[in-house]
C-alpha cells in the first residue's frame, strides 16, 4: 500500500529509502533506512513476493550496474547480501529497471548524443 522513494547521494554513495502512501493526499515521507550501495542509484524495483530489491546505478557515469538484494523487506536490516553486476551498455544514462523474475530484468536508458537511441534491454543473470 506504499511507494518506496529512493534518494541519490553522490558524495556518500548510499541510497536512503522513504515510504509514502499510494493514496492521493499530502504526506510526509517516512524514512525507513539507508543502503550502502557504493554507487549512485538511477532506478529501482521491488517485488514483495520474491522479496527482491533491484537497483540500477553508476559510479562515475561511464559504467552502469544492476544490484540485487535478496530477502529484502521493508524492515530495513544492515546485513543484506548485495550483488553488483556490470550492465554491458556503454556510456549512456540507465533510467529504470523492472523485475521479470529472480534472474531477468527489463532495463531502459535515455537517448544520448553518443548512442543516438533510447534503449529497452532484457538483462539476464
Locations of the language-model features?
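Sequence/structural signature of beta-propeller domains
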Residues: 1-125
